[in-house]
Structure formats: C-alpha cells, structure tokens
C-alpha cells in the first residue's frame, strides 16, 4: 500500500467562539493532500483532563495566548512526524504521547497534540478521497447520532443566576436526524417568543442557548415545556428533557450549594428523584461532583435504571477513570471530548472501553468552539449514537449540525437513526 507521507506541518494561533486564541494545525502530505484542524476549549473543566497549554502572558490576549503550543507544533512535533505515514494514526499518536512524556500532556499541551492528531487524520482521509467518518469508521459507520440540544444556558456558560449549566431538549419523536433538528429549531424559536413576551432577555450564552436571568431550575424547565407545547409538540410523544448540572462548580466541603439550598449528597439525590418525577428528564450530566464518588453511586442506584447519567468531569475521556467508574457502578454513560485526552487514538480507545463496559458514549463539543466539524465525523465513525454540540444558534454550533445533515444526505437509505427511547437502550 502506498504510504501517505507527511511533508509539512504548520500551526497558527486563531480565535475560538469566545474570542480567545486556540491552535489550528495544517498538515500536507507528499501527494499534495492536506488536512486542517482547530482545537476547542472548555470553561467548565475536570481536574484530571489533559492540560490546555496557555502562554500566561498578560500582555497578550489576557494571558490566554497559545504561542507556546504553536511553537511546539512547528518545532519539536513537526521534526518528529515529518516523514511519517499519516495513515498510521496509532503510530503518530504514540509519537505525540512519547514526545510529551507526561500523564496529562502538560509539556506540549493537549491543544498542540490534538490539533496535530486530527489534522493528520484529515490529511490521510483526503489522500484516500474519503470523508473523515468513512476513513475512521469503515463501511459500518452509518449511525446518525441522536442530538442533545442545549436550549437554555446557565452556570459558567452564561451571565445569569441559573446554577445548572445546560437545559436540553431531546427530540425523541423525530424519525431522522434532519427532522430532529427541524423540530428542535421550532421549539427554540417558540422559546424565544415566550421569553420576549415575559420580558426576559433573548441573549444567548457560550453554547448558543438562551441565557435569561431566571433564578430557578424549575422555572427554566417550565419555560421549555411551554415552548414545546407552543410548537405543537408534547413531552409524551416528541420531546424529553436533559440537564448538565455541572455540580462540581457548586460543591464544597461535601455540600452542594445552589439556589439558596445547601444539600448533602443524599439530599441532592432525593432532589433529583423528585425533579425526574415532575419533569420528563431522561438524561442528566455531571449531576454529582467529580470528587463525590459515594454520591455518584447513590445516584446511579436510585436513578440509573430510568435516566441516562452522564459523567463528564468524572471521567474526562480517560480510560483509567472510565474503568474505575464502570467497576464501581458510577453513572451509566460517558461524555467524550477529544481535547480532554489529547489524541484521536486515545479518544477512540475511550469510546471502545465505554461501550465494552455497557455504558453509552456521547460525543461532545466544548463551550469555546470553532467552525471545525471533526466531532460530527467522530460521532458517526464510532457509531456511538449520541452527540451534544450546543444550541440552534451561533455558527460554531450549527457547523456541526449542518455537517451531520450533509452526511445524512450522503448516506441516504444506509443511514440508521435510533429515536424514541431507543437511543438510550
């Protein structure tokens, strides 16, 4: 087989959706094929995720420049991988891991290693004249992901009083991905009208969801249910609800402090139980703190049979942590974020471990995004069946949805889409 030899590697500093710098990498092969990838950035980050290398120079971009990561790509990384076969992804990623030599990519930065890893895969796919999802996933990559769509932002993603970070709609009644997006967009616009009529701001947060200055979780959920019904849908047949609590942000000294409440782990689990009884919530992310292992076990025992319990900060796309969670029965699903681990190979290894343990995998964006659509392709290549990539506004979010709509059109009858409650089974 002809090798796809890397001829040139180049990185630059560009801006993400929050106006902060991030790393973009371009790789050119000897046959002229190229691949370009840009790296996202999180605001709500797990303690154990791979390090995003920043310059810490307050005179540039408020200390958030990424010239150190860019220098690493253009220097030590380029010197190591030029001449390597871009189609040998595992060898390239192994070289990146060994070059860094730390457990959390703190030497070169996960923003440097991931940019190179993704750009290399894209260059190889283009050399083979294949879409990235087909190159990565083979002929069996045909499952369109079920979207978990953020419609109200809170927490560190918005300047409002909501403690919970994301309120999501789950279009369980749609029979195709494009239909799920259409239905969800209709609910989104109905929610905008409702917020305006009630005198709330319709400004959006980092992930494109509305960020009204409401104070309670219940009011946010009531508004969403109203929007669903105003769009002529129901929570029985068309939509369920989801939450990203991001509870680590309000957990301290074994107490959860939010909305004028101070709850123990046991009390918070009971609060969630009552919330699920009142509202059609079928997915909850980071409902317990990443440090509260006993709380996670309590929650999983109480709600794990009826609600998808997604671990993000708990697992940070790290196989060691995923293995521990599966063994100790914490959560029942894993959020997969490539920049939490730093290479494409490690990302797919984490997905494989998640699936083999009987857990669900949810491919995810970050709150600081670019127009890069790689996660859309990873979702299909891995046949994971779920994606979380923000709301139905802001082009950095819509780029991912639009790419999936294009892929669905390309797959035509071969596209599989699990709706109703099948996406969690």
Swiss-Prot record:
GO cellular component: cell surface; extracellular region; phosphopyruvate hydratase complex
Family matches, as InterPro entries: Enolase, Enolase-like_C_sf, Enolase-like_N, Enolase_C, Enolase_CS, Enolase_N
Cofactor(s) in the UniProt record: Mg(2+)
Catalytic activity: (2R)-2-phosphoglycerate = phosphoenolpyruvate + H2O
Enzyme class: lyase
Subcellular localization: Cytoplasm; Secreted; Cell surface
Cofactor note as given: Binds a second Mg(2+) ion via substrate during catalysis.
Pathway(s) of this molecule: Carbohydrate degradation; glycolysis; pyruvate from D-glyceraldehyde 3-phosphate: step 4/5
GO biological process: glycolytic process
Record PANTHER family: ENOLASE
Entry protein name: Enolase
Provenance organism: Wolbachia sp. subsp. Brugia malayi (strain TRS)
